UniProtKB/Swiss-Prot annotation:
Keywords from the named record: Metal-binding, Zinc, Zinc-finger
The organism's place on the tree of life at top rank: Eukaryota
Xref: Pfam families: zf-A20, zf-AN1
Protein name, as recorded: AN1-type zinc finger protein 3
Source species of the chain: Mus musculus
SMART domains membership: ZnF_A20, ZnF_AN1
AN1-type zinc finger span: 151-200
Record bears the keyword Metal-binding: yes
Binding site residues for Zn(2+) 1: C18, C20, C32, C35
Matching SUPFAM superfamilies: AN1-like Zinc finger, Glucocorticoid receptor-like (DNA-binding domain)
PROSITE patterns: ZF_A20, ZF_AN1
One function term, GO molecular function aspect: DNA binding
């Protein structure tokens, strides 16, 4: 009676676990019902049942062999894919090598027109540049070079020989090199040999406002420049 009471006082222990993961039983050699049935089918009727330790070791060995077989089966499946990769690379590599010179020729063909266009632009600019540049006017003829005689005294008018003051000498000096009085200082009054109209055109061209090439391409709001 004392032994029975001590056994009842003990906590219930967990059943043994089968190698497959399910709960086993001591009656079925610590195996689940399915594993125990498979084990009985494999064992012949005449042979005696082995011990529990041997059965467990056999099950573990079978599981390890099955795992090894699975790994051996899966490994060959990867090898063909790995072997196919170099073949694909070998197939694609000639295409890239063949396309290499094609791309070089394409680059050359694309670059050559740009060089020609730059040359054409430079020629057009050189042709247009003389039009924009002002014409050079020859130096005015000196009194010595022209058929007219040299003025002896700058204190008197070259046309009427009237005496001139200092202010009249400064105001009456002409670009042809002679000094005239107030009555003959205009070019029409003393038959001036200097090309005043050509000089005026030249000065107008020099003072002309040159338009910037960027005009019309940039956007600017009205009133931004004033702020």
């Amino acid at each position: 009676m004392g032994d029975a009471g001590s056994e009842r006082s003990k906590a219930p222990s967990l059943p043994p676990r089968c190698p497959c993961g399910f709960w086993g039983s001591s009656k079925t050699m610590n195996l689940c019902s399915k594993c125990f049935a498979d084990f009985q089918k494999k064992q012949p009727d005449d042979d005696s049942t082995p011990s529990t330790s041997n059965s467990q070791s056999d099950l573990f060995s079978e599981e390890t062999t099955s795992d090894n077989n699975n790994t051996s089966v899966t490994t060959p499946t990867l090898s063909p894919s790995q072997q196919s990769l170099p073949t694909e690379l070998n197939v694609t590599s000639p295409s890239t090598e063949e396309c290499g010179p094609c791309t070089d020729t394409a680059h050359v063909s694309l670059i050559t027109p740009t060089k020609r266009s730059c040359g054409a632009d430079s020629q057009s600019e050189n042709e247009a540049s003389p039009v924009k540049r002002p014409r050079l006017v020859e130096n005015p003829e000196r009194p010595e070079e022209s058929g007219r005689s040299k003025q002896k005294s700058r204190r008197r008018c070259f046309q009427c020989q009237t005496k001139l003051e200092l202010v009249q000498q400064e105001l009456g000096s002409c670009r042809c090199g002679y000094v005239f009085c107030m009555l003959h200082r205009l070019p029409e009054q003393h038959d001036c040999t200097f090309d005043h109209m050509g000089r005026g055109r030249e000065e107008a061209i020099m003072k002309m406002v040159k338009l910037d090439r960027k005009v019309g391409r940039s956007c600017q709001r009205i009133g931004e420049g004033c702020s």
